[in-house]
């Protein structure tokens, strides 16, 4: 079967990360954004910086979040698609990006958690009734952000954040671990 229909990548190219970054920079200052915009920006920045699946992003919990001046670290204890016996808990790191606060996932997340959603939090959903966010909801939000940025969502889905962010990082010489 492998030789009859060998696996192929979904995309032969990826979207330009600069288009999305320019769009996300325009959503600043955070204090003037509607909750839905802030939610979309936070989700997009966390997805870009972490390059994680939407399932992993939906498993992030402020109960297992440690934030310092240098960044935010999440410990993911949930069973994920990539989980296997003997493997330790997944750590998701969001380093601070003081060079450009408009694109800093760490500071955007902290503002979202501490300033905008503290009073309504049962989860990080942006519309009533504020319920737990599923991986499908996160993937849909990421697709909405791509669409708003002018990226063709008939080709690219929320999962494309993983490939686009890592491709951009490699092209800039950022080490991936």
Language-model features: where?
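Extended, non-catalytic subsegments within catalytic or DNA/protein-binding/adaptor domains
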Residues: 1-177
